[in-house]
Structures are given as structure tokens and as C-alpha cells.
């Protein structure tokens, strides 16, 4: 059965189609906006002694491709500045920071994990009283989209969230979602609730399998180990998958990526400067090429 892209998924699919060219061009471009030039000049200040400086960035797995591309350009513009990236689920990264891992900049795929580390967040959000976030540096950096993907050549007839819900109710497919501590899993839980589906019952019936981060969910769909999975638009791009539907705000809310420098950052000023660079038009072009919306 030929899979059609729903109207909700059209913009994401269109962005995926043009993403490769933008990511390829990013590293070799010599053009620069005024804001990115200013940020680059500022970044050079901390590495002015000629010694190399390594920024440690903890970021949601869905940022792997874009941050690597942007960092390549940034390092070329700022000799001596290098990056050590830790890409994983936001829940895992939050735990590592809490346990004392060195981290200059944290970019989460959800507000929940950032709030848990931010003492200025509400008591409902900062349930453990943790104080790792430099609150003045915190910004909402990006918005992503939650999409439904199926393996290439699938004949299950899953072409929308509506049809997914019907198959889940019939218990005749295997569906993959993120764990409950992973933002994409939390968004998926909201989608299931939207359709009055009970995750625990579906899992007990053997209808659901899990991934520890969004990349694992994407891999299971790509390898046709499952009949469908919920991932981000950006991860659909990186895996070469075409989304068949896009979740609405009513289904799971907005997918906002907050970013903040950590209070115990080894290179706090340089981290702030790189975060400022991530908010330039130049960086936005890379983010938006794979389906993100720069905020």
C-alpha cells in the first residue's frame, strides 16, 4: 500500500527534502550575518591565549546532526574552540548532570528535564530542589514536531495517528515509543491518552516496545522491527524516513527545547557565547533545514 503524507506532516516532509544540501553547505559557507560575526568575535576572547578550549555540551539525541554541523562552522570561525558532545535522552543527561558530570551547556528536548535542574522553576517542576542551571542564561531555543513514521514499504495501512489508534485498539501491530523518562516517550504518552488508549494495557498485550532514546525508536522503525513509531521530525530526516502524520498541539502540546549554561560550567562565558551563536540566523538555517523552528 502506498503511504501518503497527511496535511499535518507536509511541512516536515518538505523540510526533510531540502535538509541534506543545507547541512552539507553549512561547513563550507563563508557568509556570515552581523550577529553571528559578533558572537564569534566574543568567543575568541576566552581562547585568546592560543590554548585550545573544549566546550562540553550535553544535548538531546535529536540534535546530533545539526549541532555537529554548526560546531564545525563555529570551530572554523573560532580557532582553538573545540567541542565534546554528549548526545542522549534528556532524562539520562539530566541524571548525569545531577550526579556531577562536567557540562558547560545543556540543551534538553523538553522543559521537564531542565526544570528539574533549575532552582528558579516552580516547586512542581523542580521537585528535588536541584540547583544546576544558570537561570539568567536559560532560553527556549527550538521547537520540534512529533511525527508518526512507518517502515518503508509498509502494508499495514498506518497512514495517520487516527489509523494508528485503530490498530492499537485491535492489538494487531507492534508499536515503538520512547521510555517514560524520555521526552519523546512523554509526548507519545499524551498522544495515547488523547485517543483514550492505555499504555500499560497495550504493553501487557505485547503491542508496545520501547526505546531508551529517540534514536533507538527511529532505528526500530528503519529496520522494520516494528510496524510504527513516534519520533521527532528531525530524527525522521536523519534516518531517511518520511513521516505519515504530524501530531497537533492538542495531541501532545508544543515540543520546546530549552538551553542553559550550567552553574558549574568549566567555561561558562564561552558556553554563553556559543549559545548566543546558536540563536543567530546562520545557525537557524541549519536547524530549520531538518524541521526545527528557531525561537
Regions inferred by a protein language model and the residue ranges of each:
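Alpha-helix termination/capping residues and helix-transition junctions
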Residues: 20, 99-100, 223, 268
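A short alpha-helix-loop-beta-strand transition element characteristic
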Residues: 127, 132-141, 200-203
Amino acid at each position: 500500500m502506498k503511504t501518503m503524507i497527511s496535511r499535518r506532516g507536509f511541512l516536515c516532509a518538505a523540510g526533510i527534502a531540502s535538509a541534506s544540501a543545507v547541512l552539507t553547505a553549512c561547513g563550507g559557507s563563508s557568509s556570515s550575518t552581523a550577529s553571528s560575526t559578533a558572537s564569534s568575535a566574543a568567543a575568541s576572547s576566552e581562547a585568546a591565549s592560543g590554548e585550545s578550549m573544549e566546550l562540553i555540551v550535553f544535548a538531546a539525541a535529536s540534535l546530533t546532526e545539526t549541532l555537529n554541523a554548526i560546531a564545525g562552522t563555529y570551530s572554523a570561525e573560532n580557532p582553538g574552540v573545540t567541542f565534546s558532545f554528549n548526545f542522549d535522552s534528556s532524562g539520562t543527561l539530566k541524571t548525569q548532570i545531577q550526579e556531577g558530570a562536567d557540562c558547560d551547556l545543556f540543551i534538553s528536548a523538553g522543559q521537564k528535564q531542565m526544570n528539574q535542574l533549575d532552582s528558579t522553576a516552580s516547586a512542581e517542576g523542580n521537585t528535588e530542589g536541584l540547583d544546576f542551571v544558570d537561570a539568567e542564561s536559560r532560553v527556549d531555543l527550538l521547537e520540534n514536531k512529533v511525527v508518526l513514521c512507518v517502515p518503508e514499504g509498509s502494508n499495514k495501512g498506518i497512514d495517520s495517528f487516527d489509523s494508528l489508534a485503530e490498530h492499537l485498539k485491535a492489538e494487531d501491530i507492534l508499536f515503538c515509543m520512547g521510555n517514560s523518562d524520555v521526552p519523546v516517550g512523554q509526548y507519545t504518552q499524551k498522544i495515547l491518552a488523547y485517543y483514550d488508549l492505555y499504555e500499560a494495557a497495550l504493553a501487557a498485550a505485547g503491542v508496545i516496545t520501547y526505546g531508551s532514546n529517540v534514536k533507538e525508536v527511529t532505528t526500530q522503525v528503519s529496520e522494520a522491527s516494528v510496524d510504527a513509531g513516534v519520533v521527532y521530525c528531525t530524527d525522521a530526516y536523519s534516518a531517511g524516513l518520511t513521516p505519515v502524520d504530524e501530531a497537533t498541539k492538542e495531541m501532545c502540546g508544543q515540543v520546546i527545547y530549552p538551553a542553559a549554561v550550567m552553574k558549574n560550567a568549566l567555561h561558562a562565558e564561552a558556553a554563553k557565547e556559543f549559545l548566543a551563536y546558536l540563536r543567530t540566523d546562520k545557525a537557524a538555517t541549519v536547524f530549520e533545514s531538518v524541521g526545527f523552528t528557531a525561537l
